[in-house]
Amino acid sequence: LERYIPRARHVEIQVFGFGDGRAIHLHERDCSIQRRFQKVIEESPAPGLPDDVRRRMADAAVALARQQQYAGAGTVEFIVDARSFEFFFIEMNTRIQVEHPVTEMITGIDLVALQLRLAG
């Protein structure tokens, strides 16, 4: 049974895992503004997201990457109820996404270079 969330937001947490159980998050991107199921605008930090929700989402994303001993850049995606701020896991994209420059701009971290260093 699936839950219907009438005012849903699509929020992603950028993670980077080192392959040995260590992982970090590089903040979130709100990609709720979409047209024909394609992202139009990515915003970071996600506007109006309470700090405690932001922290719990980041903790959940990092825990997933750590538990899997994930190596490299990945994006953990969530649906967030805009009224209650309850969030639900959608999927993890195990690659660098086209939106990675948004994260690079706010963190100053070159994700492609970091991936290459991990691989080398």
Residues covered by each model-derived region:
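ATP-dependent carboxylate activation and anion-phosphoryl transfer catalytic cores
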Residues: 2-120
